[in-house]
Each structure stands twice: as structure tokens, then as C-alpha cells.
């Protein structure tokens, strides 16, 4: 995890978290390059300043440039809140909610043999371990979990062909073996977590429309909380949504109002996911307001560090 610290002339600081993983190498250098246009400016006028920085990076819209802007925006808003001695959520209109529902994200993914050693935990190597993990989720106080696709073959691993990491790329069309293994995995989680726990499934970018239809139809009877599906065509996502009963969550990889609007207009998802470290908390609030106009609820995307968790919590509170 990486952090940006801004210091105003009076010594007030603002801090944000950003991440160079998952397609964002070199982000620190971009932040440093963009910040040269912000030096000496009024940090309280963050909307004006971010509009200027957006204009200066207009021809490199999205991607790493947007993540750099978001890191700066988040630090500016934090600086303003510290200067006024108020929580960030007060700058967003005050707390609408004081308690937030949480789910255990990427449940089991980091306990597969490849990464379990780094966390000093027992590796998950079979379905019995999944059952035990489901019990641990509930005993830890969580009412929901989100998981990925695991294959328990000779070397248990996470199946993620959409990231060119495993078999199935570039066709992005799951085999019967994958569909059956995924069903067994979800049933094992249900056995361990019990009938009342919500189970969410992250399928982001792993398939094309044909593949998503085959997977979601095969699992639609399991009563999952949502299928999480990221792809970049609103019409394709809307087709998938119309084809199943399970809610669809999406859009964690989008940037800004212009990125989200086509998906809202296509009625492509039931839950819109917003990444605060990627969009900036002020812009995220705008996206949430746009979602509300289309009667769509919002959830944060947060699989980073503890500061990002706090940033997302302030966003959700508002």
C-alpha cells in the first residue's frame, strides 16, 4: 500500500491511500508529476483545483491519470477536514447512517497455498477447508462473504482467466469442470456459513457475455446475494442482468460520471460499486447521487489497506 501526504503552508496535513498494484505501475510518479500544478494553490478549494487538474490531464483521461487525481482529491478533502476539526463525512453532508454492513471480501483467496504463508494462516486446499472457513466468517461476526473462483486440483489456485493468470484465457468461456467446481465451492461455503449468511460471487472480467450467461444460469438457483461482473459494454451487462434472478453488482473499475452514466442508462446493474481510491471521495459522492437518480444502490470497492477502509466508511456514512 502507498500513501500520499499533503502539507499546507500552515502545517495542516492531509493523507490518502493509493495502490500501484493491478495495472497501475508508476502511479507514484504520475502523482508527483500532476502535483506540480497544485503547488501554491488553495487546498480548501478542492473542487476548483481538481477541475483544473482534470483539464490538464484531459487527453489521458481515466486509468493511472485518474487514480493520481483521486489520490490528490482524497488527501485534499482530508486536509480540509483536519483544518476544520471535523470528520470527512461532515464535509459530504453529514452522516446519513451510523452503522454499516460488512462482508468478508475475497474470502479464501489469500488463504490458497500461494499466499497463505505470507499471512501465517493454514492454507485452504479442499472443500472441507471451505466449510471451515464459512464457519469462521460467521464466528468472526460477519453476516456476509464474497469469494472468487477456486480450483482444487493438484495445485489449488484461484481461477482468473480474465487477468491472463490461469487456463481459460483468451477464450474467456468457462468449461463444465469450472462451473461444477464453482458450484461445489459455493455449496461448501453455504454449509459452513449457514442459511442466513449472504454469499457474493466475484466474477469480474473473467468471461465474455457467453461465458457469463453459462455461469450465472448454472448458479442462479443458489440464492446468492449478487453476481459481481465487470465488463465494459453496458448492453452486454444488461443482457446478463435480464437473464438471471440473482442481482448483478458492477462498475468498480469505472471512473467518473461519464464512465458510469451509460451503465445506469442501460439499467445494467442492481448495485453500483464505486472505488473511492480510484475516483476520489468527492467524485464518488457525485456518482452515488447519479446512481440514486436511477434508483440504484451503491457499495464501495475496498480491498486495500486500513486507511482505504476508513475512506470508504466515510463515503458510505454519507
PLM region descriptions:
Residues 95, 101, 192-202, 241-251, ...:
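Short beta-strand/loop segments at the ligand-binding rim of alpha/beta enzyme cores
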Residues 34, 48, 217, 223-226, ...:
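Shared catalytic-loop signature of beta/alpha-barrel
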Residues 53, 86-100:
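N-terminal amphipathic alpha-helix/helix-capping segment at the start of soluble metabolic enzymes
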Residues 11, 34, 72, 85, ...:
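Conserved, mostly hydrophobic/aromatic
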Residues 99, 104-238:
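Metal-dependent enolase-superfamily TIM-barrel catalytic cores that perform enediolate-based chemistry
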Residues 7-84:
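Metal- or metallocofactor-binding catalytic centers and their adjacent structured scaffolds
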Residues 2-6:
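Short beta-strand scaffold segments in enzyme catalytic cores
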Residues 15, 83, 101, 122, ...:
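Ligand-binding pocket scaffold of soluble enzyme catalytic domains
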